C-alpha cells in the first residue's frame, strides 16, 4: 500500500526541518505534519507573564471552548477628556495579587463587543489587545475585560491565542511554558 496524501504523516525521516531535528524533537513540542512548524504543548493551567503591565507568574486557565481570552478587571469605566477620545480605565487583577500595585491602567484603544459566556449568556464587554508571554515568546492577543473574582483563575486563554501560537493542550499537564522558560534560564546561567 503506498503512502500518499495524509497517510504518511508520521513517517520516520532524517534531516532538518525548519530548525527542528526530525525524529528528535525537544520536550514540549509536537510535529503533527512534516511540512509545518512544530506545535507547542500547553497544560490545562499555565503561568503567564504580561510584560506591558509588569506582571509575571499570573495563573491562567487554558480554555479551548472560549474563542477570546479574558483577564480579571474591576472598576471598569470610561473617562472622557474634552477634545480627546474616551479612555478605558481599569483596575487590573485584585490588590492581593503579587505584582498588582493597585494603580489603574488606561487603554486608549479598545472596542465594545458582545461576548458569549460559558453559560450561553451574551454580555457586552470591553476588549483590548495585550501582549502575553509563553515559552519566552510574546504573543499579542485580544482580551475581554470582566470581573472574574468568582473564578479560580484570573486569566483565561482562548482559542484565538492558541491558534496564533500553534499550541496544543495536554489536559493532564500544567505550567509547561513556565517550566520551559525556567530550564532555559538555568541553561543560560551555567558557565
Describe the role of every protein-language-model region.
Residues 22-33:
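Short, Lys/Arg-enriched N-terminal segments with co-localized hydrophobic residues
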Residues 31-191:
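Pepsin/retropepsin-fold aspartyl endopeptidases
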Amino acid at each position: 500500500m503506498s503512502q500518499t496524501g495524509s497517510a504518511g504523516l508520521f513517517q520516520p525521516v532524517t534531516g532538518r526541518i525548519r530548525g527542528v531535528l526530525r525524529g528528535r524533537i525537544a520536550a514540549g513540542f509536537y510535529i503533527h505534519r512534516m511540512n509545518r512548524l512544530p506545535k507547542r504543548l500547553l497544560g490545562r493551567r499555565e503561568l503567564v507573564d504580561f510584560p506591558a503591565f509588569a506582571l509575571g507568574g499570573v495563573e491562567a486557565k487554558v480554555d479551548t471552548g472560549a474563542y477570546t481570552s479574558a483577564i480579571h478587571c474591576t472598576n471598569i469605566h470610561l473617562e472622557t477628556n474634552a477634545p480627546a477620545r474616551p479612555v478605558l480605565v481599569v483596575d487590573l487583577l485584585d490588590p492581593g495579587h503579587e505584582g498588582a500595585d493597585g494603580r489603574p491602567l488606561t487603554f486608549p484603544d479598545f472596542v465594545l463587543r458582545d461576548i458569549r459566556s460559558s453559560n450561553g449568556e451574551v454580555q457586552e464587554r470591553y476588549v483590548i489587545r495585550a501582549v502575553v508571554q509563553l515559552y519566552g515568546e510574546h504573543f499579542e492577543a485580544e482580551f475581554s475585560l470582566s470581573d472574574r473574582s468568582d473564578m479560580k483563575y484570573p486569566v483565561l486563554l482562548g482559542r484565538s491565542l492558541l491558534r496564533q501560537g500553534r499550541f496544543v493542550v495536554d489536559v493532564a499537564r500544567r505550567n509547561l511554558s513556565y517550566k520551559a522558560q525556567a530550564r532555559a534560564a538555568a541553561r543560560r546561567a551555567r558557565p
